[in-house]
Swiss-Prot record:
The gene is clpP. GO terms for biological process: protein quality control for misfolded or incompletely synthesized proteins. Belongs to the peptidase S14 family. It is found in: Cytoplasm. It comes from Buchnera aphidicola subsp. Acyrthosiphon pisum (strain APS) (Acyrthosiphon pisum symbiotic bacterium). The keyword Nucleus does not apply. This is ATP-dependent Clp protease proteolytic subunit. Keywords: Cytoplasm, Hydrolase, Protease, Serine protease. It is an enzyme of class 3 (hydrolase).
Amino acid sequence: MLYDQIKNNKTSSYATFIPMVVEQHSRGERSYDIYSRLLKERIIFITGAIEDNMANNIVAQILFLEAENPEKDIFLYINSPGGIITSGMSIYDTMQFVKPEISTICLGQACSMAALLLTSGAKGKRFCLPNSKVMIHQPLGGYQGQASDIAIHAREIMEMKKKLNKLMSFHTGQSIKKINKDTERDCFLSANQSIKYGLIDFILSQRQ
């Protein structure tokens, strides 16, 4: 029991630990957390479950980088199991709205909503690392309440399914019929399969 508590505490501390980077300047030193330092290089990370707070942070970073330089690409690194559809759609809409082209790179996994964000990057600038996995499926949802309310939510999730499949079809070039068929169950694709499907454009094995 004590070992489990120690192990859980270590896991928690690793999960919340953010490395710091120290840079030397003429006026002394300045320290950044690693993500802020990478943001200076126009790199944004989508990691973990997609939810409202995380999505708001991603949107804010994209808008900030657009204000800094509307002509320079933004690099979006994705390692996410997916999450809340409306949260993900706020990121998606912002990606399509801003002037800079957004290059998407999957490392680890891009599942569900994260897969849509991966494939919605600028054409020719969507990448996977060699051992990444992409998973597409239909929306998940559940609701408790009065029968009429359950019917309303059921209609809404079916409309959301149609919208997501239409977007996936647009970005991949696959037919709506094929997207509907493939997303009926969890559909896992390797990096190579993701290229053939049209989810990404290239596999990155080494930095050029």
